[in-house]
């Protein structure tokens, strides 16, 4: 879906006119494309003393293909990254900041007391202004409820307020999110980092994501098609946001069941055919809807995902 004012304000003439008239100039936000890298630019890595995730992060970055640079407080990263064949180097010289980067990531798993928070302050004090527009900020800690002492739990809980504040202060379409990684789940970081560092997370900021130990599910073989083999029902799929959601699900490899009211049958059939999915015309508020939905789901062998798009009713 296009935004006429957004496109105009970011054109050569529109940018000049909006500047003269004092009108807002919204940024063009990145959109995910399968032919682009997860992160278009370098990632600056920092960590608290005793950071526990450097080896898992090196493995994840090698798999994702992220180019990293190390903050001066994390000199051990360069040797570790080189062992994984990562392109890396040191960021900045003494107190002078280095080149602009696309993402910041801080490993806060080593924080056990608020007295150690100087490390995370120093990292963002040095680097916050060096993040490019549309960049990413990720902080990784340990779940507070799993901490061994009240002091450790307190400093880990405080990370949530920090990431939310960063998201508000940095602006320029920069997102800021917190990841709590449980003990024993370190090798599960890749999928979360792929999401948070990529344009997939353009509208996700100030959130807390928890990574626990796996319960049997396997990571997708093809990261470009993470929903391959899944069946997804999307309501309100004939137009607007519902249609856009259905397109994303199909792009990610899912078989899409497009549902909308019978009055929207023409548009529903069109998008289902275009996406290689199936159209299901019914009113989910009707008395017989539960039985019809159950019958349709059983006929498909079950649905893996249901996206209920709450639209605006037109009287």
Enumerate the predicted regions with their spans:
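Glycine-rich nucleotide cofactor-binding loops and adjacent beta-alpha elements
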Residues: 1-226
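Conserved glycine-rich cofactor-binding loop
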Residues: 49-50, 231, 238-239
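NAD(P)H-binding Rossmann-fold N-terminus in SDR/SDR-like oxidoreductases
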Residues: 51-56, 240, 244, 313
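Conserved glycine-rich Rossmann-like NAD(P)H-binding loop of the short-chain dehydrogenase/reductase
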Residues: 65-79, 254-269
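The beta1-alpha1 cofactor-binding region of Rossmann-like NAD(H)/NADP(H)-dependent oxidoreductases
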Residues: 280-292
């Amino acid at each position: 879906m296009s935004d006429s004012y957004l496109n105009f304000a970011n054109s050569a003439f529109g940018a000049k006119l909006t500047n003269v008239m004092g009108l807002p100039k919204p940024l063009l936000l990145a959109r995910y494309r399968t032919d682009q890298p997860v992160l278009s630019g370098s990632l600056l890595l920092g960590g608290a003393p005793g950071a526990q995730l450097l080896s898992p992060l090196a493995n994840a970055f090698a798999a994702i293909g992220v180019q990293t640079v190390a903050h001066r407080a994390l000199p051990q990263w360069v040797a570790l990254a080189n062992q994984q064949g990562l392109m890396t180097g040191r960021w900045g010289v003494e107190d002078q900041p280095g080149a602009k980067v696309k993402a910041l990531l801080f490993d806060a798993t080593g924080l056990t007391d608020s007295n150690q928070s100087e490390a995370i302050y120093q990292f963002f004090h040095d680097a916050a202004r060096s993040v490019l527009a549309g960049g990413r900020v990720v902080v990784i800690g340990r779940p507070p409820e799993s901490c061994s002492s009240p002091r450790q739990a307190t400093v880990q809980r405080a990370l949530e307020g920090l990431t939310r504040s960063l998201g508000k202060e940095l602006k320029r379409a920069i997102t800021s999110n917190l990841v709590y990684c449980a003990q024993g789940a370190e090798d599960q970081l890749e999928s979360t980092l792929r999401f948070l560092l990529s344009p997939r997370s353009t509208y996700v900021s100030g959130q807390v994501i928890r990574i626990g130990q796996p319960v049997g599910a396997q990571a997708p073989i093809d990261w470009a098609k993470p929903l391959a083999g899944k069946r997804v029902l999307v309501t309100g799929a004939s137009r607007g946001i519902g249609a856009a959601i259905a397109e994303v699900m199909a792009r990610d490899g899912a078989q899409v069941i497009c549902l909308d009211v019978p009055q929207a049958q023409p548009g529903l059939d069109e998008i289902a055919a275009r996406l290689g999915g199936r159209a299901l015309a019914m009113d989910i508020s009707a008395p017989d809807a539960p039985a019809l939905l159950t019958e349709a789901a059983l006929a498909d062998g079950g649905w893996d995902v249901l996206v209920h798009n709450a639209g605006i009713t037109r009287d």
